[in-house]
Amino acid sequence: MTFTIEIEQEEDGRWLSEVLELPGVLAYGQTQDEAIAHVQALALRVIADRLEHGETVPQMANIFSVTQ
């Protein structure tokens, strides 16, 4: 499974990125790359937390795809 990262620039210039398949997983950054890196790290933490609590997670080979 691939997680889709949607990214857009806010009016204040910051970038907001969100993992569409993981509700609530979003992050800001001063640049596109920073916002993407932050949301990828957060998504991996969420997935690790789910695994720790015995929840199933989708099989992952190519984890992220970025869209604008």
Residue ranges of model-derived segments:
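Short aromatic-glycine-(Arg/Gly/Cys) micro-motifs in beta-strand/loop hairpins
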Residues: 7-22
